[in-house]
Swiss-Prot record:
It comes from the Eukaryota. Belongs to the class-II pyridoxal-phosphate-dependent aminotransferase family. Keywords: Acyltransferase, Endoplasmic reticulum, Lipid metabolism, Membrane, Phosphoprotein, Pyridoxal phosphate, Sphingolipid metabolism, Transferase, Transmembrane, Transmembrane helix. This is Serine palmitoyltransferase 1. Its EC number is 2.3.1.50. SPT complex catalytic activity is negatively regulated by ORMDL proteins, including ORMDL3, in the presence of ceramides. This mechanism allows to maintain ceramide levels at sufficient concentrations for the production of complex sphingolipids, but which prevents the accumulation of ceramides to levels that trigger apoptosis. The chain crosses the membrane at residues 16-36. Its cofactor is pyridoxal 5'-phosphate. Phosphorylation at Tyr-164 inhibits activity and promotes cell survival. It is an enzyme of class 2 (transferase). Component of the serine palmitoyltransferase (SPT) complex, which is also composed of SPTLC2 or SPTLC3 and SPTSSA or SPTSSB. The heterodimer with SPTLC2 or SPTLC3 forms the catalytic core of the enzyme, while SPTSSA or SPTSSB subunits determine substrate specificity. SPT also interacts with ORMDL proteins, especially ORMDL3, which negatively regulate SPT activity in the presence of ceramides. Forms dimers of heterodimers with SPTLC2. Interacts with RTN4. Pathway: Lipid metabolism; sphingolipid metabolism.
Amino acid sequence: MAMAAEQWVLVEMVQALYEAPAYHLILEGILILWIIRLVFSKTYKLQERSDLTAKEKEELIEEWQPEPLVPPVSKNHPALNYNIVSGPPTHNIVVNGKECVNFASFNFLGLLANPRVKAAALASLKKYGVGTCGPRGFYGTFDVHLDLEERLAKFMRTEEAIIYSYGFSTIASAIPAYSKRGDIVFVDSAACFAIQKGLQASRSDIKLFKHNDVADLERLLKEQEIEDQKNPRKARVTRRFIVVEGLYMNTGTVCPLPELVKLKYKYKARIFLEESLSFGVLGEHGRGVTEHYGISIDDIDLISANMENALASVGGFCCGRSFVVDHQRLSGQGYCFSASLPPLLAAAAIEALNIMEENPGIFAVLKKKCQHIHKSLQGISGLKVVGESLSPALHLQLEESTGSREKDVQLLQEMVIHCMNEGIALTQARYLDKEEKCLPPPSIRVVVTVEQTEEELERAASTIREAAQAVLL
């Protein structure tokens, strides 16, 4: 039976071949021959290659123009025209051999030259040596690190804290530790560069809202809510984060935290709060923007800050609930893969915290001086003050731009030089122009510390006024 069936199939095939149109047979034959040619033919023929003559080679070499190793840089670039500082950047700073009152360094509480902080750092140096020579997970954890984390958690009234060896890497590591590809981050358009790098590393979907504009943020949250309703399955695994600064580095303004907390609960998002500028500045005890507004620390999912401003040390920290902080010990790249904070800097930060707790009146003094300089800088012809009266870092921008960023920077730099010649050390706010997501206008940054006297504040304001008249008018 099987042989009969095979013969019948063969007969059908032959019959179909006879009945097929001629053009169909020709086309199939051509395709078969083409396939055979492709299988057995070489990709190229050696005899078809033609070598260039010596003359043609020389012509190609002469025509070739290599790309520059580095992009062209103006001779006026600040990196090529730097100031040389002799000694520590304390209240009085020596710049290019001239002593000035320091209005440029973020030494808000004046702890950089504090004898107690120096003594604590020196004692730690004698006990532990200079560095740890390893990350926290590889014999880089010293008892002083654990003491500092415990003190920070207690000071901020959170369950746990984690320290990083570099302030910039703190928030830049914390964001990608939680927010991943597919998650959505709503971030203020004035966010600092460290936040921007953290968002870039997270590969999340970034949605910018207008600076401190709660209505614009809610608009974006509503739009996302509508999108989530279209695809509930995807929405269930998509996390939503709101990333803001307590006191913005680029604008000197305080975030509207109470309204943000309301939106957090309404739209089921998480809040990451960067407090590098507000920690040790805002609040009755210097705990930052949460204390300033009287908001429970439990309403914020993660708080980060560096220790290079108010604490006059190096590094940064994150604090919050234990399960949130513990995750960073496994996923925070700046924590896992960087050498841990030198013990002497951890000891210095602990002593700085001791001083802050023993002398809470220092924050009221700083606030008063911030308000003083903010008022004194008003009404300078050609300049506008950007920042709130609570901010120890204010920006002076041109009232009217020349139309060229390079010329604006040059005018402001002439003012900085004029002030330096008069004994007032200022600096321009520096940005990586091509890297910034929303590049702020050029500005002179004025930094207030508790060490500056009222006479020095008035002198700085009058010197800036004179510089504006000399350069801008």
